[in-house]
C-alpha cells in the first residue's frame, strides 16, 4: 500500500485557559480497553476553492477552540497521587492534542470508499502513530490528509479510557461546528466530564447474575472448528434480507432476528454438540442516552455496559 507524506506535526493547546486539576475516572472507564480508538472521516470537496477546503490554519484554530469545552482531551493520562500504584485519572494539564497534516498524491476518495473495510493499513496511512497508552500519554491525536482528488481524510486517535465512540462523535461534531463559524461556547451540546456520576455504590450489592464478570469456563477440547485463527469481517445485510429474516422469526425486532442468526451460525461453525455446550453472547449497551435524559446533561465518558447471555447450544436448523 502506498504511503502518505507528512507535512507538519505539532501540539495544539486550547485557545483559552482551561480548568486545571484532575478528572476522576469511573470503573466503566477503567474497565474499557486501555488504548487508542482509531476513527476516520471522509470529506468530499464542496466547492472549487481547493485551498480553502479544510485549510490547515482553520482546522487547527478550530481544534484549539474545541479543546476549550473539551479541555480534558488537552490533558494527559495520569495517576492519582503521582505514584505507580495510584488510580488512573485525567490530569488536566492543558498541554494540548497532537495535530498532523499530510497529503497523498496516490489516493482519491473513491479509491478508499469503494468496498471500504477497516484495516491496519488504513490506520497506518490516515491515523497518527500513537504512543504507549499509559501515563503520561496524550489523549487525542488527529491527522488531516489531503487527497489527489481534493477530498480529505480526517483521522483521529482518542484514548478509550477517557471517551467512547459516542463521546468522540460529540467532539467531532463540536469541532466541525466551530470550523464552520460557530463560537466555541456554542457547542451543539456542552459536554459534562463529571465521571463521578457513575461511581459505584459504597456497599457492593450484586442483584443479578453477571456471567460476563465471572472467570471464563475451561476451554473445550480443540478441534478444527475452534483452533483456527480468528479473522474480522464486515457482513452487510440488505433491507430485503433483514425483512425476510424478521418474517422467519415471527415478527421479532431487527436486533433479535440478527442476533438469533449469528447465534445459530456460531453454533454450526464451532460444531458444538447440542445441549452439551454453553454459548455466550456478549453485546454492548450504551446508557448515555438514559443518563443524559435523567440528568439533563451530555455525559462524556464510557457509559457502556457489556451484558452477556448464556444458553445451551440447541437449535432447529431453519436457515
Curated annotation (Swiss-Prot):
In terms of superkingdom, the source organism counts as Eukaryota
One Pfam family from the record: Transferase
Main EC class of this protein? transferase
Q: What is its EC number?
A: 2.3.1.-
What residues make up the catalytic site? Answer: 160, 301
GO MF, one term, reads: acyltransferase activity, transferring groups other than amino-acyl groups
Keyword Disulfide bond in annotation: no
Keyword Transferase in record: yes
Q: Which UniProt keywords apply?
A: Acyltransferase, Transferase
The entry sums up its family as follows:
Belongs to the plant acyltransferase family.
The record's function comment reads:
Hydroxycinnamoyl transferase that catalyzes the transfer of an acyl from p-coumaryol-CoA to putrescine, to produce coumaroyl putrescine.
Q: What is this protein called?
A: Putrescine hydroxycinnamoyltransferase 2
**Taxonomic source organism:** Oryza sativa subsp. japonica (Rice)
Amino acid at each position: 500500500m502506498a504511503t502518505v507524506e507528512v507535512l507538519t506535526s505539532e501540539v495544539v493547546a486550547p485557545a483559552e485557559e482551561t480548568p486545571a486539576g484532575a478528572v476522576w475516572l469511573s470503573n466503566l472507564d477503567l474497565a474499557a480497553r486501555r488504548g487508542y480508538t482509531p476513527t476516520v472521516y471522509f470529506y468530499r470537496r464542496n466547492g472549487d476553492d481547493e485551498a480553502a477546503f479544510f485549510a490547515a490554519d482553520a482546522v487547527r484554530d478550530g481544534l484549539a477552540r474545541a479543546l476549550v469545552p473539551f479541555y480534558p482531551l488537552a490533558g494527559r493520562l495520569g495517576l492519582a497521587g503521582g505514584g505507580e500504584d495510584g488510580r488512573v485519572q485525567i490530569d488536566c494539564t492543558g498541554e494540548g492534542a497532537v495535530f498532523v497534516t499530510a497529503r497523498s498524491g496516490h489516493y482519491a476518495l473513491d479509491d478508499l470508499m469503494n468496498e471500504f473495510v477497516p484495516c491496519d493499513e488504513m490506520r497506518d496511512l490516515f491515523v497518527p502513530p500513537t504512543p504507549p497508552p499509559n501515563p503520561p500519554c496524550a489523549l487525542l491525536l488527529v491527522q488531516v490528509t489531503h487527497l489527489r482528488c481534493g477530498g480529505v481524510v480526517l483521522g483521529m486517535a482518542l484514548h478509550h479510557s477517557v471517551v467512547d465512540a459516542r463521546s468522540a462523535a460529540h467532539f467531532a461534531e463540536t469541532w466541525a461546528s466551530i470550523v464552520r463559524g460557530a463560537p466555541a461556547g456554542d457547542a451543539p451540546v456542552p459536554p459534562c466530564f463529571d465521571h463521578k456520576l457513575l461511581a459505584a455504590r459504597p456497599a457492593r450489592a450484586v442483584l443479578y447474575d453477571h456471567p460476563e464478570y465471572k472467570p471464563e469456563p475451561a476451554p473445550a477440547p480443540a478441534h478444527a472448528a475452534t483452533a483456527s485463527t480468528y479473522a474480522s469481517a464486515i457482513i452487510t445485510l440488505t433491507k430485503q434480507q433483514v425483512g425476510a429474516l424478521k418474517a422467519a422469526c415471527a415478527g421479532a425486532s431487527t436486533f433479535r432476528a440478527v442476533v438469533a442468526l449469528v447465534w445459530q451460525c456460531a453454533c454450526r461453525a464451532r460444531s458444538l454438540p447440542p445441549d452439551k455446550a454453553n454459548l455466550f453472547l456478549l453485546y454492548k449497551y450504551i446508557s448515555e442516552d438514559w443518563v443524559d435524559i435523567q440528568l439533563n446533561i451530555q455525559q462524556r465518558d464510557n457509559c457502556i455496559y457489556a451484558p452477556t447471555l448464556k444458553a445451551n447450544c440447541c437449535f432447529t436448523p431453519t436457515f
